[in-house]
Amino acid sequence: MSSWCSSEDAHNQSSTPSTRSRKSSWLISKIDENEIDKEVQEMMDDWRRSNEAENHVECIKAALEYCRDKLKELLIDEEDTEMDGKETKTKPINIVSNTEFPEDRDVLGNLVNCLDRQQKAARQQMYFDKIVQLGLERQALQDEAVVSTSSPLDECRAEGHEFVMQPVRGGHNPCCEVCMHTIWRLVQWWRRCRVCGMRAHDKCAEEVKRVCAGVLSTRAKFELNTNLCEERSLAEQEYQCAECTAPICFDGVAEQEARLCDYSGELFCPNCHWNDVWSIPARIVHNLDSTPRPVCRAVKQLLAIIDHRPLIDINESTLSLIKFHKELRRVNELRRNFLLMKCYFVSCRTARRLRILQYLNAHSHFVDNSVMYSPKELRELCDGTLLPDLEQIHTVFRKHIEEECETCAGNGFFCELCDDINVDQKNKILYPFTENTRSCATCLAVYHKKCFERKSLNCPRCERRRKRTEIPKTLSSSDEKEAVRN
């Protein structure tokens, strides 16, 4: 009995793992998601080796034909299987050596058939997805080829606009800003100005009457309007649109509705005013009001182009605003500190190697002056997002100068006007951007504000320099007297 048991155990040990492994392999058998990609990629590599002179678009076309053929084979195989129906049944694989449970064979056979159908359906879906992916890739390459190989004649110029032909593919169908009809991308050629973004049919591009906003913003006499404009009446405009002179009114049909542009104060027709909204620079400057308000298409394109340009002088226009607005005062203080810190970074080899001024890359004009702002920066100031960013950059700059860099720290100052009683205060290193300090306007030496005012604004460093310049004069005068005596 022991031998029988041992042989049975050996039989179970030898047969059970293989049976379990085969069952598990059928139960979890799935198509690898990358299998089709690898198969198509190998086919494309073979095609490139045999067709070296062809371009990538032709290779994608060959891959598309390959995927279509494979998908067609799977569909034909599926149709044949459905026609056979119940007449042809797949024989179940003999998994268990003994035949005590014959009904298990039918169950496993049906399971194999079901998994086989699922695998074929999965492969069909993967080939279909690959066909869609390759088709989109081929269309993108063709569109790029059209744009990149376009000659100067393909660029249409009118009223300063630089209209460039656009590809057929896209997310939505835009509206032509000349004829006001929809641009059906699949059946109509259309162009877009590379400067201001104006869109028009290919046939309408030469009929544009609006001057490009990029041309207006680059003129020598261009100035951003920072004055609040009064609303003009229909009578002042002779009941005409301020741009295209089309008839407008308030009580007529929708096509003649008069729409106000808050930037210029003029009235426009619906073709020239699409109810676009934008923050008005004049309201930001005078009221710190960044609420978007309706503007016409021309103004919207202009404000979008100059949004990052430093065109607004806060010191000249709104001195009272700086006085009563706490955040604006702090921003002006940080900007003055940036200019002082720039002097340290220019003479520091480590700062140049780290390119530490790149932290102000989004505000590059901050290292040139402390008064000019762009409309976008003033809008961020009103929203409360500008000041935290500048505070963070200021902390990084100050940490480099005071703690991390010995070269920058060595260019600090000691207050020479402090009393000997305050030893800790006297031995503290001061910098031009340190709080409660004053700098001499002549030699730029830094002192505590209270000490400098207590000494009647007298700078000991300037006094030493003045004495050193007087010594050669006294020596030269004494030499002249001795020469006269002799």
UniProtKB/Swiss-Prot annotation:
Keyword Iron: no
Listed Pfam families: RH_dom (PF13901)
Phorbol-ester/DAG-type zinc finger span: 160-212, 393-459
Keyword ATP-binding among UniProt keywords: no
Name of the protein described by the UniProt record: Differentially expressed in FDCP 8 homolog
Keywords: Metal-binding, Repeat, Zinc, Zinc-finger
Chain intervals for the UniProt region annotation (Disordered): 1-26
Family (UniProt): Belongs to the DEF8 family.
MF-aspect GO terms: zinc ion binding
